[in-house]
Amino acid sequence: GHGHIDARTEALIFAASRAAHASQVLRPALERGEVVLTDRYIDSSVAYQGAGRNLGTETVRGINEWATAGLQPDLTVLLDVDPADGRRRRTAGDATEDRLESEADEFHARIRGAFLDLAADRPEQYLVLEAHLPVRELAGRILDRVDALLALRQSSSA
């Protein structure tokens, strides 16, 4: 049937989408000297398909690094939320959950653990924030980190 997508296919679809995004959107913008913000990147696949779907984090990382020709972010912002709190937040509105969002809390706990492990392995690249903080506080902390990163980049190119 057309309803179920197996884990490998899902991983490859996300990697293909990321390949197109990197070559058609990210690289051209970076070549123009623009600052690029993007929602979800390689580490999302590592967490969701590698850990969540049990395909192996290194396998999924390798596929995605190849797909994006090694393009890496300067900063990854992780808004951390407990799986049960995340479900409550998602179902509080009228939005219906997608295929990944509707997975069991155990699946989301594996993903959260994978993201926190990635952040612990690369603290210089990650900004981990508690998602329950007020939006203004989250925005302020993110802007502070981005401003520091841009200032560092300007001083190194001067």
Where in this protein do the model-derived segments appear?
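ATP-dependent small-molecule kinase phosphotransfer cores
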Residues: 1-68
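NTP-dependent small-molecule kinase module
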Residues: 84-158
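A generic structural signal for alpha->beta connector loops
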Residues: 33-34, 73, 123-126
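A glycine- and Lys/Arg-enriched "phosphate-lid" helix/loop adjacent to the NTP-binding pocket
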Residues: 44-113
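Hydrophobic/aromatic beta-strand patches that form the interior of the parallel beta-sheet core
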Residues: 37, 75-77, 127-129
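Short beta->alpha linker loops
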Residues: 17, 41, 81-82, 130-134
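Short, solvent-exposed coil/turn segments
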Residues: 7-9, 72, 122
